[in-house]
Curated annotation (Swiss-Prot):
NCBIfam families: dksA
SUPFAM superfamilies referenced in this protein's UniProt entry, alphabetically: DnaK suppressor protein DksA, alpha-hairpin domain, Glucocorticoid receptor-like (DNA-binding domain)
Designated name of the protein: RNA polymerase-binding transcription factor DksA
Reported function: Transcription factor that acts by binding directly to the RNA polymerase (RNAP). Required for negative regulation of rRNA expression and positive regulation of several amino acid biosynthesis promoters. Also required for regulation of fis expression.
Subunit organization: Interacts directly with the RNA polymerase.
Family: Belongs to the DksA family.
Length: 151
C-alpha cells in the first residue's frame, strides 16, 4: 500500500490528476502573474484533496484489516504494517499543513520567491515541488550545511 500511496501523492502525478499540463511560460510574461498563481493553486488544492482522501483511506484500511491474531508473529506483522500506515498518514498530514501554508502564500501574493534570498524559485522547480520555499541554490547550500552538521 505504501508504494501505491507514494505513486498517488507525487506532485507530478497530481499535475496529471488535476488535468493540467506543465505551464508554458511566454517570453514576455511576468513571473507569478494571476495565470501562474491560478495554475499552482489548482495543483496544490488537487494535491491536498488527494492526500485527504488517502488519509481517510488509511483509517478505513486499518479498521477493515484490524484482526486479533492468536499467533504473536502474525500480530507483530500486523502491528508493524499499521505502524507504517500511521507513519505515512502522519507524513501526509504534515504535507497538508505545508500545502495550506503555501496556499496562503498564493493568497497573499507572496508565492514563488525564495525565503532566503528573495530570488524567483522558478516555474519548473515549483511544478516539481509546489511547496518549495527555497531556490535551488539556497536549497543546495542548506543541504550541504545539514550534511556538515550531521557528519
Amino acid at each position: 500500500m505504501e508504494k501505491e500511496q507514494n505513486k498517488k501523492t507525487s506532485s507530478l502525478n497530481v499535475l496529471a490528476i488535476a488535468g493540467l499540463q506543465p505551464y508554458q511560460k511566454k517570453t514576455d510574461e511576468e513571473y507569478m502573474n494571476e495565470k501562474q498563481m491560478l495554475h499552482f493553486k489548482k495543483i496544490l488544492e488537487t494535491w491536498k484533496n488527494q492526500l485527504t482522501i488517502e488519509i481517510n483511506h488509511t483509517l478505513l484500511y486499518i479498521q477493515d484489516k484490524s484482526t486479533n491474531f492468536p499467533d504473536p508473529i502474525d500480530r507483530a506483522a500486523q502491528e508493524e504494517e499499521f505502524s507504517l500506515e500511521l507513519r505515512n498518514r502522519d507524513r501526509s498530514r504534515k504535507l497538508i499543513k505545508k500545502i495550506q501554508e503555501t496556499l496562503k502564500k498564493i493568497k497573499d501574493k507572496d508565492f514563488g520567491y525564495c525565503n532566503s534570498c528573495a530570488v524567483e524559485i522558478g516555474i519548473r522547480r515549483l511544478e516539481a515541488r509546489p511547496t518549495a520555499n527555497l531556490c535551488i541554490d539556497c536549497k543546495t547550500l542548506a543541504e550541504i550545511r545539514e550534511k556538515q552538521m550531521a557528519g
